[in-house]
Design a protein with these regions (language model features):
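Bacterial Sec-dependent N-terminal signal peptides
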Residues: 1-22
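Catalytic-site signature segments of enzymes, centered on catalytic residues
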Residues: 135-216, 235, 242-257
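Generic structural signal for alpha-helix termini and adjacent loop/cap motifs
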Residues: 60, 94, 126, 158, ...
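Active-site helix/loop module of the DD-peptidase/beta-lactamase fold
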Residues: 75-79, 93-135, 180, 185-222, ...
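Extracellular/periplasmic catalytic domains that process cell-envelope and extracellular macromolecules
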Residues: 37, 67, 98, 113-117, ...
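Catalytic loop of the DD-peptidase/beta-lactamase superfamily, centered on the K-T-G motif
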Residues: 19-56, 142, 183-186, 192-196, ...
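Short active-site loop at a secondary-structure junction
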Residues: 32-42, 63-125, 162-173, 244-247, ...
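Extracytoplasmic/secreted proteins, especially bacterial periplasmic and envelope-associated proteins
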Residues: 24-31, 78, 83, 87, ...
Length: 365
């Protein structure tokens, strides 16, 4: 996911919401296809355990005029990362993983690096020094990997960008290593572990690992918007098997809301572990700090006021934001890459429209 700096202002809490309070949000959702920023998009708000509003616009398949809805399956890109982070923290809670231990304690075939020791924490907070994709071929998913270990083998012998634990270098590959850790420690495949311990527990009935050889019902086609604003259907397989734990999942906007709720009500990990997960990390960073699997957006002095994650890859622009004090989650999911900046802006409109923030605060990401 490309990092972009944007200033976003939240408004004062406006009291109880009603369906017509989401007029601006609905306009934002409909604007994205109308202005050809996205082909299809859906957004939603969850409050106090209930989905109180959803809206969608555009198409999941333009040629066949199939509408994009809140239950349309599409990629979620890097929103896979907080799901994977929580899985690691579940193993931590069980005493099976030490966050300060070298990764080789759990993934013995990951090489020891001359630059320094990579710990589990370093992988979770992107300070491992592992680089992102080395080529367009890797970034666009031209090859298929049968296992996460095969995917890890592509990059495991490369030099690090920096000594581990010093600076945030956002990398999906670090989360691939965490996926291998989950498999080795749990004795289950990544997909099976996530299904049993994350998606089923959160009530996420339409979430899974994207596979190029599976024909999905109700899954959106993929579209890409180039720098000139022209949108085309993504050609080829665009295989995600080289990044599954960090960006290889599909879901619906409703499932993203359910995931956020499971985080807020501590269905997946304890309140203590949640607090640990949201601690600001002692590393250099550019823009908003990264905790363990989440960006911390608030600048009110309490970083945990608003946290979330975005996602951008071929055929996807996505954002989820959680507002714990309001027991609220907002999410937007689009089937078109190249429009993530507009998606995060629309996400803040959802928060504002629902009156889910109570300080004149500024969020930067």
């Amino acid at each position: 996911m490309k990092k972009v700096a944007v200033l976003l202002a939240f408004i004062v809490f406006g009291g109880l919401y009603a369906q017509n309070d989401f007029k601006k949000s609905e306009e934002q959702i409909k604007r994205l296809p109308h202005e050809k920023i996205a082909v299809g998009v859906a957004g939603g708000v969850l409050h106090d355990g209930k989905i109180v509003w959803t809206c969608s616009s555009g198409f999941s398949d333009v040629e066949n005029q199939i509408r994009f809805t809140p239950t349309t399956l599409t990629r979620v890109a890097s929103i896979a990362k907080p799901m994977t982070a929580i899985a690691v923290l579940q193993l931590y809670e069980q005493g099976l993983v030490d966050l300060e231990a070298p990764i080789q304690d759990y993934v013995s075939d990951f090489p020891v690096k001359e630059e320094g020791t990579i710990t589990v924490r370093h992988l979770l907070n992107h300070s491992s020094g592992i680089a992102e994709y080395a080529s367009k071929k890797e970034a666009h998913g031209a090859d298929n990997y049968a296992t996460l270990t095969e995917a890890m083998n592509v990059f495991k012998n490369r030099e690090l960008l920096e000594k581990p634990g010093i600076e945030e270098f956002y990398t999906t590959y670090g989360y691939v290593v965490l996926g291998v850790l989950i498999e080795r420690v749990s004795g289950m495949s990544y997909e099976a572990y996530m299904q049993k311990n994350i998606w089923d527990k959160a009530g996420m009935v339409n979430t899974g690992v994207e596979k190029v050889d599976v024909a999905y019902t109700n899954k959106s086609l993929l579209y890409d918007r180039n720098k000139n604003g022209k949108i085309k259907k993504v050609k080829g397989s665009s295989d995600l098997s080289n990044r599954v734990p960090g960006g290889g999942l599909y879901a619906t906007v409703e499932d993203l809301l359910r995931f956020g709720q499971a985080v807020l009500d501590h269905t997946l990990i304890s309140e203590t572990s949640t607090a640990l997960m949201l601690e600001e990390q002692a590393v250099k960073y550019d823009g908003n700090p990264y905790a363990l699997g989440w960006f911390l957006y608030s600048q009110s002095g309490e970083r945990k006021d608003v946290f979330g994650h975005g996602g951008s890859q071929k055929g996807c622009s996505a954002q989820i934001m959680l507002v714990p004090k309001r027991k609220a989650v907002v999410a937007i999911l689009s089937n078109t890459s190249g429009g993530w900046g507009d998606v995060i802006g629309a996400s803040v409109t959802l928060i504002n429209d629902a009156g889910l923030y109570d300080d004149n605060d500024v969020v930067e990401k």
